[in-house]
Amino acid sequence: MITTTIFPGRYVQGAGAINILEEELSRFGERAFVVIDDFVDKNVLGENFFSSFTKVRVNKQIFGGECSDEEIERLSGLVEEETDVVVGIGGGKTLDTAKAVAYKLKKPVVIVPTIASTDAPCSALSVIYTPNGEFKRYLFLPRNPDVVLVDTEIVAKAPARFLVAGMGDALATWFEAESCKQKYAPNMTGRLGSMTAYALARLCYETLLEYGVLAKRSVEEKSVTPALEKIVEANTLLSGLGFESGGLAAAHAIHNGLTVLENTHKYLHGEKVAIGVLASLFLTDKPRKMIEEVYSFCEEVGLPTTLAEIGLDGVSDEDLMKVAEKACDKNETIHNEPQPVTSKDVFFALKAADRYGRMRKNLT
């Protein structure tokens, strides 16, 4: 039995970490191609941020908004031949796009998340969408980012919703890794996960339960606290290592299914993954104590527990079945669950999860 565990080359986290970005880039050379969110460029770093660089010349390009094949192709055409390193600065889709551009051009990549809303930063994976925002495919990359740099002072100033969504994404990590472990299903490398991966996935879950509420309060006050540092690490590093080396299963497949309904597109990745986690609890018949624990956590930090909270109030059975069918595509990770799963199973699990969430809110 061969197991494989993969990691980013270097993980840097802390208040003020952005101030050592040039130092990290200079290890790769003198020319950097930067893909950055427009909002981050203007309002977080400032448009003149790179003008203070003395060791590295920067070719800065604004991200178009969607991690699509078209955007990857557009940006790749703007990279100068002598570029030494590609840099992604912003949210998950910006980072995934930068990783894809670096892969296409065979360059090292440095990832700088400005929100802790997904576990995308550390992974050797880009999630590709259509230009309209519908999930298209996973792009598996041959290597993880060379550097992931997270400035928690920047994260603390972002709206709390982003950190909470990151907790929703991270919430799936242990449940999906545990399913893969039980089934001997492969992780994202195509091989089995290691003891290390499963332990990190469990640590991720425990950290969320222990520090999630305190971390949310910290970002609401725009303060960097030990609780925030722990949750940023859980959302970014632990979840990234856990999902990639532990494996994905139902929760992310259900997220992908939800993207077929346009009303969900304005909601964050982790918000939809949280619904996938809740549905998976009923899909895999988890003990009531665990179901209560997960719903309570979601309610405390502000994650959605009903379909209405991700834009699907009054969703028809026909549309919900479309979600279930997409989630059960033959190439989806839902087939890493220990038992066979059909679209009808997912349909009923979604309805059960929604009903339970509404019951707890006294809506039924």
Curated annotation (Swiss-Prot):
Glycerol binds at residues 119, 169, 252, 269. Pathway: Polyol metabolism; glycerol fermentation; glycerone phosphate from glycerol (oxidative route): step 1/2. Transmembrane segments: none annotated. Zn(2+) binds at residues 169, 252, 269. NAD(+) binds at residues 37, 92-93, 114, 117, 123, 125, 129. It holds the Pfam family Fe-ADH. InterPro entries: ADH_Fe/GldA (IPR001670), ADH_Fe_CS (IPR018211), Glycerol_DH (IPR016205). Binds 1 zinc ion per subunit. Its EC number is 1.1.1.6. GO terms for cellular component: cytosol. It catalyses: glycerol + NAD(+) = dihydroxyacetone + NADH + H(+). CDD domains: GlyDH. It is an enzyme of class 1 (oxidoreductase). Its cofactor is Zn(2+). One of its GO terms (biological process) is anaerobic glycerol catabolic process. Keywords: Glycerol metabolism, Metal-binding, NAD, Oxidoreductase, Zinc. SUPFAM superfamilies: Dehydroquinate synthase-like. One of its GO terms (molecular function) is metal ion binding. Belongs to the iron-containing alcohol dehydrogenase family. Catalyzes the NAD-dependent oxidation of glycerol to dihydroxyacetone (glycerone). This is Glycerol dehydrogenase. The lineage of its organism: Bacteria, Thermotogati, Thermotogota, Thermotogae, Thermotogales.
